Amino acid sequence: MKKHEIASLSEDELKKQLVELKQRFADIRFNKIVEPPQNPMIFKNLRRDIARMKTALHRYQTQK
């Protein structure tokens, strides 16, 4: 996800997306043992998306 897409999400949507991304990252990481991923850059992209969402959530929480 792009930075502006994440910024447009509400706090609840961010939490939901964060859980989904963490689950997807865990699934891909687990499946890496069985067979290598088609796109190895997916790990880097997912980690960065998770970090962006955590940052946006932190902004919401500090503004309150």
Curated annotation (Swiss-Prot):
The keyword Glycoprotein does not apply. InterPro entries: Ribosomal_uL29, Ribosomal_uL29_CS, Ribosomal_uL29_sf. The keyword Ribonucleoprotein applies. It comes from the Bacteria. GO terms for cellular component: ribonucleoprotein complex; ribosome. Gene3D superfamilies: 1.10.287.310. Keywords: Ribonucleoprotein, Ribosomal protein. One of its GO terms (biological process) is translation. GO terms for molecular function: structural constituent of ribosome. Pfam families: Ribosomal_L29 (PF00831). Belongs to the universal ribosomal protein uL29 family. This is Large ribosomal subunit protein uL29. It comes from Chloroherpeton thalassium (strain ATCC 35110 / GB-78). The gene is rpmC.
